[in-house]
């Protein structure tokens, strides 16, 4: 994955073009972040379709490095509340480690995101918030 590839991926993610986003993933990816584990493309679609009903999420890439096996990104993930995403809604959807977001609230988080690659496709994703 090149920087240009990742720029296209981030642009598709920011535009919520899930079909284009999913084209970057292997058939059965494994994502693990903040207590969520996703192992199929359908789970990936379901998770982001749910979350993005409540928030507008965008990724700003600050640093990028890659090899044939790994892409590493440091960036700012911006979350803007479109509707109230309450503790009750989060808990009911297995998202206990996520924070509530009120309509109009903006959260910006620096994240390190690591993508493991096989044949140019994302097979695993992990991320960490950096204080």
PLM ranges: what are they?
Residues 1-131:
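C-terminal and inter-domain tail/linker signature
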């Amino acid at each position: 994955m090149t920087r240009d590839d990742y720029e296209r991926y981030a642009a598709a993610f920011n535009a919520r073009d899930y079909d284009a986003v999913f084209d970057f993933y292997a058939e059965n990816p494994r994502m693990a972040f903040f207590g969520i584990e996703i192992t199929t493309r359908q789970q990936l679609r379901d998770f982001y379709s749910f979350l993005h009903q409540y928030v507008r999420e965008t990724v700003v890439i600050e640093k990028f490095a890659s090899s044939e096996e790994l892409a590493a990104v440091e960036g700012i993930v911006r979350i803007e509340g479109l509707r109230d995403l309450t503790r009750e809604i989060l808990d009911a959807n297995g998202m206990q480690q996520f924070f509530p977001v009120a309509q109009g609230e903006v959260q910006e988080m620096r994240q390190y995101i690591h993508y493991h690659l096989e044949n140019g496709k994302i097979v695993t994703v992990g991320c960490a918030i950096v204080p």
